[in-house]
């Protein structure tokens, strides 16, 4: 049996005017479609569980945490923010976030000692770290905790929240989902820094934040 991920049955009662973007845009990107595994930590973010076992994340909480994260990240000097993705679908979203906000970024394999060893080939000293998935970006997560660096993380239904200072519940594996979340975070950071007006937009849509994979549209 197939499921329509764009159905409004997947969202709690909420008006578009109360969200950063219309509900349908959230649904079309699949930000709300979580994994079939649900940790106890993440139960508070789950709206419902589909008959096939997949968790549907509450878009009100997605929206709320993106707003909160945007305000939080905007407080730091741009070049002291580090965005990370070891997962390929996060490569371009992270790069675009860094391009617009002035943040540092790492994509792909992360070398041990990046945050903890001043003699490492690539040694960085961020004041805050943004992880695309704390499980996949585990090396930076561990080092951030060791160095006392605040951690903001995109977390799916199967993630744990230990040693995460600010969690953004979301599908952190999907190509379009990651593109939309990083696009929104970028916009919120720039709005809070007053780089763009409170209702301002980026010059390109979230689709331009999506990683291009051959044969995938």
From Swiss-Prot:
Which one of the record's GO molecular function terms can you name?
structural constituent of ribosome
Q: Which family does it belong to?
A: Belongs to the universal ribosomal protein uS2 family.
Superkingdom in the source lineage: Archaea
InterPro entries, sorted: Ribosomal_uS2 (IPR001865), Ribosomal_uS2_arc (IPR023454), Ribosomal_uS2_euk/arc (IPR005707), Ribosomal_uS2_flav_dom_sf (IPR023591)
Record's GO cellular component terms: cytosolic small ribosomal subunit
Cross-referenced PANTHER family: 40S RIBOSOMAL PROTEIN SA (PTHR11489)
Per the UniProt entry, what species is this protein from, by scientific name? Korarchaeum cryptofilum (strain OPF8)
Would the keyword Cell membrane be found if you checked this record's keyword annotation?
Answer: no
Enumerate the Pfam families for this protein.
Ribosomal_S2
What is the protein name for this chain? Small ribosomal subunit protein uS2
Listed GO biological process terms:
ribosomal small subunit assembly; translation
Keyword presence, Calcium: no
Q: Which UniProt keywords apply?
A: Ribonucleoprotein, Ribosomal protein
């Amino acid at each position: 049996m197939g499921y329509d991920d764009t159905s409004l049955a997947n969202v709690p009662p909420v008006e578009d005017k109360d969200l950063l973007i219309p509900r349908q845009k959230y649904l079309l990107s699949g930000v709300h479609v979580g994994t079939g595994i649900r940790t106890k930590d993440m139960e508070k973010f789950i709206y419902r569980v589909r008959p096939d076992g997949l968790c549907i994340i509450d878009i009100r909480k997605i929206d709320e945490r993106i707003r909160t994260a945007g305000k939080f990240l905007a407080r730091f000097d741009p070049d002291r923010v580090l965005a990370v993705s070891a997962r390929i679908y996060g490569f371009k979203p992270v790069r675009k976030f860094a391009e617009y906000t002035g943040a540092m970024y790492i994509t792909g394999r992360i070398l041990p000692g990046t945050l903890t060893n001043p003699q490492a080939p690539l040694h960085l000293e961020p004041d805050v770290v943004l992880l695309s998935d704390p499980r996949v970006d585990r090396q930076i997560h561990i080092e951030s905790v060791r160095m006392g660096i605040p951690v903001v993380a995109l977390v799916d239904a199967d993630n744990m929240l230990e040693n995460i200072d600010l969690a953004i519940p979301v599908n952190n594996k999907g190509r379009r989902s990651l593109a939309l979340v990083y696009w929104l975070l970028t916009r919120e950071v720039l709005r809070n820094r007053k780089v763009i007006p409170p209702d301002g937009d980026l010059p390109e849509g979230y689709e331009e934040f999506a990683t291009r994979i051959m044969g995938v549209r």
